[in-house]
Structure formats: C-alpha cells, structure tokens
C-alpha cells in the first residue's frame, strides 16, 4: 500500500499532546488589532485545544502524528 500523505498546512498548525489531543493557536490576532482590547488580545495569545468534534478531521490530515 502507498504511504498516506500528511496535509502540510495542518502539520504546521497543530501539535499532538501526550494524551492524544491537539494544540492549536487562537485566531483573530493578525490584523485590525487597534479596536480589540488589551485583555482580549492577551487571552488570544494562549494556545487552545482542538474541539472533540473537529479532532476526527485533524487526525485524518495528520496520519503519522
């Protein structure tokens, strides 16, 4: 059987944790930042976990993670 290709965009965006979950970066922190409060931007800096409903899609994109 041929090897399964990894989706390279997903490989750059998600990191697998030891417990089997996936870490991801928060969105909305690239541009148009002046209208966002300091508190909102500070909270967006932290990593978040991929939701359980989306985890199936991430696993399909990263077969060797």
Curated annotation (Swiss-Prot):
UniProt keyword terms in alphabetical order: Ribonucleoprotein, Ribosomal protein
SUPFAM superfamilies cross-referenced by the UniProt entry: L35p-like (SSF143034)
Any one of the GO BP annotations: translation
Compositional bias segments (type: Basic residues): 10-26
InterPro entries reported for this sequence: Ribosomal_bL35 (IPR001706), Ribosomal_bL35-like (IPR021137), Ribosomal_bL35_CS (IPR018265), Ribosomal_bL35_sf (IPR037229)
Example of a GO MF term: structural constituent of ribosome
Entry GO terms, CC: cytosolic large ribosomal subunit
Transmembrane stretches, start-end: none
Family affiliation: Belongs to the bacterial ribosomal protein bL35 family.
Name of the protein in its database record: Large ribosomal subunit protein bL35
Organism annotation: Pasteurella multocida (strain Pm70)
Organism lineage: Bacteria, Pseudomonadati, Pseudomonadota, Gammaproteobacteria, Pasteurellales
